[in-house]
């Protein structure tokens, strides 16, 4: 997953902002700063494929990002972009410190206990503000919510495709 050509979903156009062609973006990256340095974004077209657009400016606005695109100066120019997903190339993103991961690198990992018991696949991540929560699907309809805390998540090996956890007592009984 280290290819610089890999596209990376970082957000979604949730609405327009004002009348000057700005877009309100919901960030999926958890790091607003990753938007601020972007020079271009790729927006997924309805029928598939990507459209690359140059970024004029990106700024934080509460929990959203306000994105201005070069050449788009009127609300009518950007209405068709509402609801679309925003991607960037992986090499446009900042490098992470040890122990930090992009969500796309965690999704799909096999989650197991420190004893080697397989719990299931990490299928979603919920951002709660204080810490993320990993949604793991076991067999059937079984869903396990695992707090993304240092004392719970013991090891992440993206190359091997697995995460090792030490579950808090009673978590599986819920």
UniProtKB/Swiss-Prot annotation:
Any one biological process term the GO annotation gives: ribosomal small subunit biogenesis
Keyword Chaperone appears in the UniProt entry: yes
Location relative to the cell: Cytoplasm
Keyword Repeat attributed: no
Membrane-spanning ranges: none
InterPro entries (UniProt xref): PRC_barrel-like_sf, PRC_RimM, RimM, RimM_N, RimM_N_sf, Transl_B-barrel_sf
Protein's name in the database: Ribosome maturation factor RimM
Originating organism: Geotalea daltonii (strain DSM 22248 / JCM 15807 / FRC-32) (Geobacter daltonii)
Organism taxonomic ancestry: Bacteria, Pseudomonadati, Thermodesulfobacteriota, Desulfuromonadia, Geobacterales
């Amino acid at each position: 997953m280290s290819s610089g050509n890999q596209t990376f979903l970082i957000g979604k156009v949730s609405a327009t902002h004002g009348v000057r062609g700005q877009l309100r973006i919901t960030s999926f990256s958890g790091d607003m700063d990753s938007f601020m340095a972007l020079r271009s974004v790729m927006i997924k077209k309805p029928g598939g494929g990507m459209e690359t657009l140059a970024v004029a400016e990106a700024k934080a606005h509460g929990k959203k990002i306000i994105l201005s695109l070069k050449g788009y100066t009127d609300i009518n120019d950007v209405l068709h972009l509402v609801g679309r997903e925003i991607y960037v190339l992986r090499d446009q993103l900042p490098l992470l410190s040890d122990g930090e991961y992009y969500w796309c690198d965690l999704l799909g990992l096999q989650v197991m206990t420190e004893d080697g018991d397989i719990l299931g696949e990490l299928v979603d991540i919920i951002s709660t503000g204080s810490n993320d929560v990993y949604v793991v699907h076991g067999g059937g309809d079984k869903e396990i919510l695992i707090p993304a805390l240092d004392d719970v998540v013991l090891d992440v090996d993206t190359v091997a495709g697995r995460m090792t956890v030490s579950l808090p007592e009673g978590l599986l009984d819920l």
